[in-house]
Amino acid sequence: MEVWAILEDLRQTRLLLENASDGVSGLWRFWFGGDLARLVFRIKQDYREEFEKLLDDIPGLFEALNLGHQAHFKEKVLSVLDFSTPGRTAAAVAFLTFILDKWIRQTHFSKGYVLDFIAAALWRTWKARRMRTILDYWPVQPLGVAGILRHPPTMPAVLQEEQQEDNPRAGLDPPVEE
């Protein structure tokens, strides 16, 4: 549950990725990183081989990222992340931290840019999935809210008359027989 609360804030998401990455010493991670950063780092270490296999299935990912193309990353990586449970969410964060570490070693971009890019992508994906989950439960909202959604707001008759174009011939043409 804590991982979901951290993903709600972009700054905390960035800090989590930074503290779980290889760019931070173990001593810093132990004293200042927090329990979740240590957990994500541990998941990343334990599943390194599986993460490597997953990245082998996505050829050209780092080349596209180095050229500034984000669509491949969004389509192949972000779209398949699973946030259904806190454990799967921690594994998704660990996978993105693994990508972060690997990309930093082979890019011309600064570490801060790469970290900001991955943190923002993770945060946006989390927010979009969370909003989709909330909207999936929309029919069980209180009756007042459901009634508002079923009946779109109507404009007062005075405003509707003002917006209608004046057509002096309206209704004067004889019906056309075909």
UniProtKB/Swiss-Prot annotation:
Its main location: host cell. Signal peptide: none annotated. Keywords: Apoptosis, Early protein, Host cell membrane, Host membrane, Host nucleus, Host-virus interaction, Inhibition of host apoptosis by viral BCL2-like protein, Membrane, Modulation of host cell apoptosis by virus. Coiled coil: none annotated. The keyword Transport does not apply. GO terms for biological process: symbiont-mediated suppression of host apoptosis. The keyword Chaperone does not apply. GO terms for cellular component: host cell nuclear lamina; host cell plasma membrane; membrane. InterPro entries: Adenovir_t-Ag_E1B_19kDa, Bcl2-like. It is found in: Host cell membrane; Host nucleus envelope; Host nucleus lamina. Belongs to the adenoviridae E1B 19 kDa protein family. Putative adenovirus Bcl-2 homolog that inhibits apoptosis induced by TNF or FAS pathways, as well as p53-mediated apoptosis. Without E1B 19K function, virus production is compromised because of premature death of host cell. Interacts with Bax protein in cell lysates. This is E1B protein, small T-antigen. It comes from Human adenovirus B serotype 7.
